UniProtKB/Swiss-Prot annotation:
Membrane topology: Single-pass membrane protein
Keywords of this entry: ATP synthesis, CF(0), Hydrogen ion transport, Ion transport, Membrane, Transmembrane, Transmembrane helix, Transport
Organism of origin: Rhodospirillum rubrum
Record's function text: F(1)F(0) ATP synthase produces ATP from ADP in the presence of a proton or sodium gradient. F-type ATPases consist of two structural domains, F(1) containing the extramembraneous catalytic core and F(0) containing the membrane proton channel, linked together by a central stalk and a peripheral stalk. During catalysis, ATP synthesis in the catalytic domain of F(1) is coupled via a rotary mechanism of the central stalk subunits to proton translocation.
Molecular-function annotations in GO: proton-transporting ATP synthase activity, rotational mechanism; proton-transporting ATPase activity, rotational mechanism
GO biological process, one term: pyruvate decarboxylation to acetyl-CoA
Cysteines engaged in disulfide bonds, as pairs: none
Name of encoding gene: atpF2
Membrane listed as a keyword: yes
Assembly description: F-type ATPases have 2 components, F(1) - the catalytic core - and F(0) - the membrane proton channel. F(1) has five subunits: alpha(3), beta(3), gamma(1), delta(1), epsilon(1). F(0) has four main subunits: a(1), b(1), b'(1) and c(10-14). The alpha and beta chains form an alternating ring which encloses part of the gamma chain. F(1) is attached to F(0) by a central stalk formed by the gamma and epsilon chains, while a peripheral stalk is formed by the delta, b and b' chains.
Lineage, highest ranks first: Bacteria, Pseudomonadati, Pseudomonadota, Alphaproteobacteria, Rhodospirillales
Entries under PANTHER family matching the protein: ATP SYNTHASE SUBUNIT B (PTHR33445:SF1), ATP SYNTHASE SUBUNIT B', CHLOROPLASTIC (PTHR33445)
Protein name in the entry: ATP synthase subunit b'
UniProt-listed InterPro entries: ATP_synth_b/b'su_bac/chlpt (IPR002146), ATP_synthase_B_chain (IPR050059)
Keyword Transport: yes
Length: 161
C-alpha cells in the first residue's frame, strides 16, 4: 500500500496541509458565514415571533379585561332590570289584589245586605204566620177570640226571647 510507504510521507503531508488549508478557506469563507447567517436569521425570526407573541398576549389580556368589564356591567344591568321588572310585577300584582279585594268586599257587603233583608222579610213573615197560627191555636183550643194587637205583642215578645 502506497499510503504506508514512508518515502511518500512528505508529499502526503504536503497534500494534507494543502487540502486542510483549502477546506479551511472554503469553510471560513463560504459555509460558516452561510451557517452564521442562517442562525442569525433564525434567531431574528424567533425574537420577532417572541415579540409578536408578547404583543398578542398583551392584546389578549386587554381584550379579556375589557370582556370581563363588559360582562360585569351587563350582569349589573341585567340584575337592575330584573329587580325593576320584579318590583313592577309586584306592584301590579298588589294593585290587582287590591282591586280584587275591593270587588270581593263589595260583593260581600251586597251579600250581607241581601241576607239581612231576607232575614228581616222572613222575620216579618214569621211574625205574621206566628200570629195567625197562635190565633188559630187559641181559637181551636180555648175557643176564644184574641185581639190582633195583643197577639202581635205576645209574638214579638216571644221572638225577642
Amino acid at each position: 500500500m502506497p499510503q504506508f510507504d514512508p518515502s511518500s510521507f512528505p508529499s502526503q503531508i504536503v497534500w494534507l496541509v494543502i487540502a486542510l488549508v483549502a477546506m479551511y478557506f472554503v469553510m471560513s469563507r463560504l459555509a460558516i458565514p452561510r451557517l452564521a447567517e442562517v442562525l442569525e436569521q433564525r434567531q431574528r425570526l424567533i425574537n420577532d415571533d417572541l415579540k409578536q407573541a408578547e404583543a398578542l398576549k398583551a392584546e389578549t389580556e386587554a381584550a379579556i379585561a375589557a370582556y370581563e368589564t363588559a360582562l360585569a356591567e351587563a350582569r349589573a344591568r341585567a340584575h337592575d332590570e330584573i329587580r325593576a321588572v320584579t318590583e313592577a310585577a309586584a306592584k301590579a300584582a298588589e294593585a290587582r289584589n287590591a282591586e280584587v279585594a275591593k270587588a270581593l268586599n263589595t260583593r260581600i257587603k251586597d251579600g250581607e245586605a241581601r241576607i239581612v233583608q231576607a232575614r228581616d222579610e222572613a222575620l216579618t213573615h214569621v211574625r205574621e204566620v206566628a200570629g195567625a197560627v197562635a190565633s188559630d191555636i187559641v181559637g181551636k183550643l180555648a175557643g176564644l177570640r184574641v185581639d190582633d194587637a195583643a197577639l202581635t205583642a205576645a209574638v214579638a215578645a216571644a221572638i225577642k226571647e
